[in-house]
């Protein structure tokens, strides 16, 4: 159960989110991912969002070139791996890796493992995403194989 208690000093709230408190949802930014809200946007009055994201479908199209309109963003890979283009550089992000993605940085997620999962923290909670022209070609993704 999520417990939220308002504090007078900061107008922020305490939040405790357990794995069964919030479901995995498919109505997030990308339809090939599943998202699990961790209650942080509500607890911070929209200052920050924290959610878990995991692979739902194979990386056939990727995210397209884009950047986020935000003040702060980090991604902590908790399982699997993903390959990004950060501007014109291929970057492999594996379980345990943490990325600070500066505001406005052009990127493209083009490949990931079936078990890929990450924690994403962004400020503000209602950050925007802007599609842009990319600086280079994208390498091919790795097809998933049936187990």
Model-assigned labels for residue ranges:
Residues 87-105:
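Short acidic-glycine-tyrosine-enriched beta hairpin
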Residues 52-56, 67-86, 121-124:
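Short, conserved beta-strand element in jelly-roll/cupin
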Residues 48-52, 100, 113-131:
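A short hydrophobic beta-strand segment most commonly corresponding to one strand
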Residues 1-57, 131-147:
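A short, N-terminal "cap"/entry segment at the start of jelly-roll beta-barrel domains
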